[in-house]
UniProtKB/Swiss-Prot annotation:
Provenance organism: Picrophilus torridus (strain ATCC 700027 / DSM 9790 / JCM 10055 / NBRC 100828 / KAW 2/3)
Gene3D superfamilies named among the record's database cross-references: DNA primase, PRIM domain
Gene Ontology CC terms, in alphabetical order: DNA-directed RNA polymerase complex; primosome complex
Gene coding for it: priS
NCBIfam families reported for this sequence: primase_sml, PRK00419.1-3
GO molecular function (one): DNA-directed RNA polymerase activity
E.C. number: 2.7.7.-
Nucleotidyltransferase as UniProt keyword: yes
Matching HAMAP family: DNA_primase_sml_arc (MF_00700)
Top-level taxonomic group: Archaea
Cofactor: Mg(2+); Mn(2+)
Keyword list, A-Z: DNA replication, DNA-directed RNA polymerase, Magnesium, Manganese, Metal-binding, Nucleotidyltransferase, Primosome, Transcription, Transferase
Protein name: DNA primase small subunit PriS
Length: 370
């Protein structure tokens, strides 16, 4: 109960001291929130930013959301009565879809997810042609990032079209059979072009290639010494063109499948597909607090993303100059605000931002000091 009351009071302090970051056309968005007591409340609507900020000051949310969709009547309870007018294209990237994340620390998770965000941004900008102004990037306040595409090109897309985009980014249909068929078109951009270059790079290094063959590699490598159309097969595999896909043998297919798995590990982006396909999705409100960490949902300039550290930039100013006592059941280590904390089980005095993180993540509890 102490942790509940303190968290509520500190979140209330935050909302009294800070402004939310308003999405466009806020009057057309459905608003929802989870209070500190009770279940989610949704189908709310506000005419402008003053109304919603007044609301959150009176009703402190643990989590605050808004719809990626635009509606004529956003406060209607039944979806068909809201009258859908379009939706942003949303991508959610967090630890839930990262292999091995259950064995990572919080900081390791953030770094790993960041790699996938960079891959996603590369797809959106270089493959789909969205400009920087059309892409809104936010640290979620939790274990990842949200990417919003705000463009006339996406508003009217239905769930199936959004699923195709998601599959492209996750390389769901990127199989050797499909690659061989698509190579006839000789694409000049996209994953197939990159995969073709990747194959050429690997076949140009015998020791590197050896990693991708299961069996007698010397025998396989000798098979590449034969001539095809006046050229050695190994030379064709090394060339940066699509001719290689016309001459692959079964043994080559085994190698290419192994290379493809490695390629996907390095270049696909692990997104939460149901979020992308949902044209009515509620997403975290920019500038709100994440109820499990006390960190803010923070906008990130995509040109400065490489240097962005959420454990500095997403820490609210109002939590930086206060301290609290927390009790931990086990030792815990984390670096926040460029300070490394090595906490022992038992009572610890820590900065308020860390106390809210520890209690929100159920790592510790507030202690009432008299």
């Amino acid at each position: 109960m102490i942790s509940y009351d303190k968290s509520l009071n500190y979140f209330s302090l935050y909302y009294r001291s800070n402004h939310l970051i308003m999405p466009d056309l806020i009057s057309k968005r459905e608003i929802g929130y989870i209070p500190f007591s009770g279940t989610m409340i949704r189908h709310l609507s506000f005419r402008n930013h003053r109304e919603i900020e007044s609301f959150v000051k009176r009703n402190t949310p643990r989590h605050l959301y808004y719809s990626s969709a635009y509606y004529i009547k956003p406060d209607e309870k039944r979806m068909e009565k809201k009258i859908w007018e379009g939706a942003e294209l949303i991508f959610d990237l967090d630890a839930d879809h990262i292999p091995g994340s259950d064995k990572m620390t919080y900081e390791e998770i953030l770094l790993e997810v960041k790699k996938h965000v960079s891959r996603l941004l590369n797809y959106l900008i270089n493959d789909f042609g969205f400009d920087d102004d059309s892409i809104k990037l936010y640290f979620s306040g939790g274990r990842g990032y949200h990417v919003h595409v705000v463009s006339d090109r996406v508003y009217s897309l239905d769930s199936d079209a959004r699923r195709e985009i998601g599959n492209y980014i996750k390389m769901e249909d990127f199989t050797i059979d499909n690659i061989i068929r698509a190579s006839r078109e000789k694409p000049e951009s996209g994953p197939l072009k990159r995969f073709n270059e990747y194959i050429s790079e690997i076949y140009s290094d015998e020791n590197y290639l050896k990693r991708f063959y299961n069996g007698d590699f010397d025998r396989y490598y000798k098979s590449l010494d034969v001539y095809k159309d006046g050229k050695k097969k190994i030379d064709i595999m090394r060339e940066n063109n699509y001719e290689k896909f016309k001459i692959v043998s079964k043994r080559d297919l085994d190698v290419l499948n192994n290379i493809l798995n490695d390629f996907k590990d390095k270049y696909s982006a692990e997104i939460d597909e149901p979020v992308t396909t949902d044209v009515h999705r509620l997403i975290r409100f920019p500038g709100s607090l994440h109820g499990k960490t006390g960190l803010a949902v923070t906008p990130v300039n995509i040109n400065e993303f490489d240097n962005f550290d959420p454990l500095i930039s997403a820490v609210p100013e109002v939590f930086k100059d206060k301290y609290e006592h927390v009790y931990l059941n086990s030792d815990y280590m984390i670096t926040m605000m460029n300070e490394k904390f090595s906490l022992n089980a038992g009572e610890n005095k820590v900065p308020l931002y860390l106390a809210l993180f520890l209690t929100g993540m159920k790592i510790g509890n507030f202690i009432e000091k008299k």
